Amino acid sequence: MPKVGMQPIRRQQLIEATLQAVDQVGMGDASIALIARLAGVSNGIISHYFQDKNGLIAATMRYLMSVLSENVTARRQALADSSPRAHLQVIIEGNFDASQVNGPAMKTWLAFWATSMHQPSLHRLQRINDHRLYSNLCCEFRRVLPLEDARTAARGLAALIDGLWLRGALSGDAFDTAQAQQIAYEYMDFQLAKQVS
């Protein structure tokens, strides 16, 4: 008989083991057996909680997306300045937070992006993540720019964030998040300078 309250603990344990496995061997070679071994549980536990490896990968991505969302939300709620610039700045910072640019997270995101092109459930998660970033950026730009300009600025900043993140993840060097953020801030300020008085 399972212990009461173990499900959330086991699920998190398996998600963390998945991040570790993808970091060590990549998503393709991150087998159920390896993940279970890293988590210190039997293979059957993964099937019990997630059905299969795809279910576990989807849960791991939902976890990373949740951490990103919670981080950005907390930063926005802590703002003393309610200007669009302040909100855009913390959205940028949240996307380059240590929770998103550590080795296991970066390798899992990269593998997720590649796999999402072939798996509908993961593609859906990718679209949700893309839309969330675009929507948050567009909402803030819309406070000072006409609708079409706000949409264009949001698309550009979202693409820049993703591109800077991708280059940082693939560089093989330590990710210079300060430089990435500065480049994104400069684009943000360029767009905000178009503000209609």
UniProtKB/Swiss-Prot annotation:
GO terms for MF: DNA-binding transcription factor activity; transcription cis-regulatory region binding
Gene: betI
Pathway linked to the protein: Amine and polyamine biosynthesis; betaine biosynthesis via choline pathway [regulation]
Record-linked InterPro entries: BetI_C, DNA-bd_HTH_TetR-type_CS, Homeodomain-like_sf, HTH-type_TetR-like_transc_reg, HTH_TetR, Tet_transcr_reg_TetR-rel_C_sf, Tscrpt_rep_BetI
Function, in words: Repressor involved in the biosynthesis of the osmoprotectant glycine betaine. It represses transcription of the choline transporter BetT and the genes of BetAB involved in the synthesis of glycine betaine.
The protein, known as: HTH-type transcriptional regulator BetI
Keywords (A to Z) from UniProt: DNA-binding, Repressor, Transcription, Transcription regulation
Phylogenetic classification of the source organism: Bacteria, Pseudomonadati, Pseudomonadota, Gammaproteobacteria, Pseudomonadales
Gene Ontology biological-process annotations: glycine betaine biosynthetic process from choline; negative regulation of DNA-templated transcription
